[in-house]
Design a protein with these regions (language model features):
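Extracytoplasmic "Venus flytrap"
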Residues: 32-54, 60, 67-76, 164
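An alpha-beta-alpha
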Residues: 35, 53, 136-182, 282-297
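Beta-alpha junction/loop-to-helix N-cap segments that form part of ligand/metal-binding clefts
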Residues: 68-123, 216-231, 235-238
Length: 317
């Protein structure tokens, strides 16, 4: 009897310990927030927007655990990610890229949603009561004007973009308008995947004097291939993001996506730490734009590094 009682007591203690461990592993620590991140695809600009957001949270000593989800371009996964975050009672969801923001906003109505790397929030329907963020819209005109100081004889620009990506369509329309106002032409080539890039480059190269790369997920991911192909024919390229310059484009005058993430992170701090209502935080544009030149590409193209535009820009080699 004593042995049986001892076994039962031992078993009960074991069960109690196991239950306690399970609770500890499943529960949040006291005061800990749950923050979800949904990123539409992996590429340098979006990765930097994620990094900047987390950096800002950490600098403000926010106590949180992260649910980090990446769709890798498969948009059907985004509603699943949103449902998972809803079930896990995320306190705030940070979305990177328009499809990510739209997919999460369609599912979650009662928690704050922040976006970054969204070009046209209003056109994308991202103006609800529980959503705000930072737009990466870039005015094409100044970038074109600065480029023309390097290549004044340029008449025809080319661009590749995914016609199914809303951000890309908005940017290309604005680019075409800016070029038309300056009496310049734009040759457009649609692509649906990275596999379309080589043929698109071949089709464009004989028609253009320069290439413009908007922040299109397909195109930005293929930038090393694009840069190499353009360099062979001494065709210069302009980019809307710094990551593309790091991957061989000549010049960008656009968004620093890490700083964009910092800016979105500051909005998260206002909501989570300072108890600001998301309704009182209208969406913002990027605080500042940066001119970045790839000097290795500039040398390949035979440009004078003492040119005023290059001299005054931030530079990488």
């Amino acid at each position: 009897m004593k042995k049986t009682l001892k076994k039962l007591l031992g078993l009960g203690l074991t069960c109690l310990l196991l239950a306690s461990c399970e609770k500890a592993s499943n529960d949040k620590t006291e005061g800990e927030l749950t923050i979800g991140v949904v990123q539409v695809a992996d590429h340098p600009a979006l990765d930097a927007a994620r990094e900047g957001f987390i950096e800002k949270l950490d600098s403000e000593n926010i106590n949180y655990k992260l649910i980090d989800q990446r769709a890798n371009g498969d948009l059907s996964l985004i509603p699943q990610f949103a449902s998972d975050m809803k079930n896990k009672k995320a306190d705030l969801i940070y979305t990177i890229g328009t499809p990510a923001a739209q997919g999460v906003a369609n599912t979650i109505k009662d928690k704050p949603i922040l976006f970054a790397a969204v070009t046209d929030p209003e056109g994308a329907g991202l103006t609800g009561e529980n959503i705000t963020g930072v737009s990466d819209y870039v005015e094409a005109g100044k970038l074109i004007d600065d480029f023309l100081k390097l290549y004044p004889e340029t008449k025809t620009f080319g661009t590749m973009y995914n016609t199914n990506e809303q951000n890309s369509n908005v940017q290309v329309e604005a680019l075409e308008k800016a070029l038309k106002e300056r009496g310049l032409k734009l040759e457009k080539q649609g692509v649906s995947s990275i596999n379309d890039i080589p043929q698109a480059i071949t089709s464009l190269k004989s028609k253009i004097d320069a290439m413009v790369t908007v922040t299109d997920n397909v195109v930005v991911n293929a930038m090393p291939v694009i840069s190499e192909a353009l360099a062979k024919d001494k065709i210069p390229s302009i980019a809307y993001d710094e990551g593309s310059v790091r991957n061989g484009a000549l010049i960008s005058e656009g968004v620093n996506y890490k700083k964009l993430g910092n800016q979105a992170g500051a909005m998260a701090v206002e909501i989570l730490k300072n108890n600001k209502s998301i309704k009182d935080l209208p969406y913002e544009k990027a605080d500042s734009l940066t001119t970045l030149v790839n000097t290795n590409t500039a040398r390949t193209l035979g440009l004078d590094l003492e040119n005023e535009i290059i001299k005054n820009a931030d530079k990488i080699d």
